[in-house]
Amino acid sequence: MDFPILSKKIRKAQLLVFFDLEATQINHQAIAFALTAYKKEKDQLIFSDKDPINYFNYIRTNDEIGPIVEEMTGITKDTLTEKGKSLHEVILDISKLLRHFKDRCFISYGNLDIEILNRSIDHNNETEENFLRNITKNYFNFQQYLYERIVDKNGSALSIHKFAEKYNIKEEGKKHDPCYDSLVLKDTYLSYIKEKEKTLSFIFENYSHNRAMTSINKALTMKVLEEGKAEKDDLIHLLEEYL
């Protein structure tokens, strides 16, 4: 099976929900929520990106946005006052939008989005608490998955925008726009799977700096000890089992 580890995380889902939040600078209170969701067949990784379910809204907050966040996102207090909804309303919107799909997988790039939700919801409100619990239960951190396979020359994780460059992904919009970032996340997911040769080349690029490859290195060492040699194809085969 191609991408066996990824398949275990994704295959049961009927709906893949790629989402991104923006938050205030200091207290990480949610100020914008975007998602793009796609129906797929069970036991499949790939889906058609036609007829997506899209959602975006600003979220009102009493917290200070912060100058750095305002500069990066273009979101101001006036934006939230004029265009924002309460987080509770946003949660109701999203719940209604996705209600027909029992098996969902929520995908973001890094668990900061989960932390933002955790900091922002009213934990005494059953609707909001259940919303967070449902996402957390069915959550896949795509950043962590990629970090265990593809790193930079310093052994560090790549940003989602760096992956967009590597896979030559083009979407309208700009960084730190949650609609744009959600689409880039979806495109990166699809490119990672569809462009397998390119993906393997990215893994090889800084393979020696990837601390997560310990198990692969041990398996390769065992092959050398048992057979006296190991070829590049042996490494590729081991890596394919790790995808």
Where are these regions (language model features)?
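Short acidic, Gly/Ser-rich segments with clustered Asp/Glu that frequently serve as metal-coordination loops
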Residues: L21-H28
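Generic marker of residues within folded, mature protein domains
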Residues: K8-K9, Q25, F47
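Broad, structure-driven detector of short, well-ordered beta-strand segments within folded domains
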Residues: F19-L21, Y38
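Acidic catalytic cores of enzymes that act on phosphate-bearing nucleotides/polynucleotides
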Residues: V224-L243
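A generic local structural motif
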Residues: D2-I5, I91-S95
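Metal-dependent phosphoesterase signature
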Residues: M72-D93
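Metal-dependent phosphoesterase core characteristic of DEDDh/y 3'-5' exonuclease domains
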Residues: Q14, H28-A32, T36-T73, L98-K229
